[in-house]
């Protein structure tokens, strides 16, 4: 008997427009009727994972940000693996010479150190979240903008950092540098 089903969101549970199809909603409700539960496993932040679930009238525990945080049915943080300030600073140092946009996923949502013009240009070139569900305004509203020095003054818990650039060559160089940081999954 199936007791638990773990489901990814992007490319699995969600349609390309970012919504859960009625067919998938029925399937998940059918699981519950059979006595099974489901949980979400995603690279998304908790806030970004919760939105399509709420819209579909579904509730589930969420393993988010590639396992960095686990939330229960009621949205309470059950477990977390934080990046240390040292790791975050090393990541910033590794990327210093590149024109990078960062998505710092934290306990208080997503932060970026990008200037708004750079952020918009990246979005318009479909480098930043190239999914149909997102408009520029919708993406912009999901981020808080901060100067690099402010990030540590805010007392944020860092869970995941996405490094965004349109060049695979640049990303390859950065990946090589980041892989040298101890206790960091790249």
Q: Which role fits each region the language model picked out?
A:
Residues 22-129:
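Active-site phosphate-binding/coordination module
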Residues 3-18, 91:
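Asp-based phosphoryl-transfer active-site loop
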Residues 1-2, 64:
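Short, small/polar residue-rich loop motifs at catalytic or cofactor-binding pockets
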Residues 94, 98, 105-186:
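Conserved acidic, metal-coordinating active-site core of Asp-based
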Residues 5-8, 28-30, 68-72, 152-155, ...:
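A short alpha-helix capping/helix-coil boundary motif
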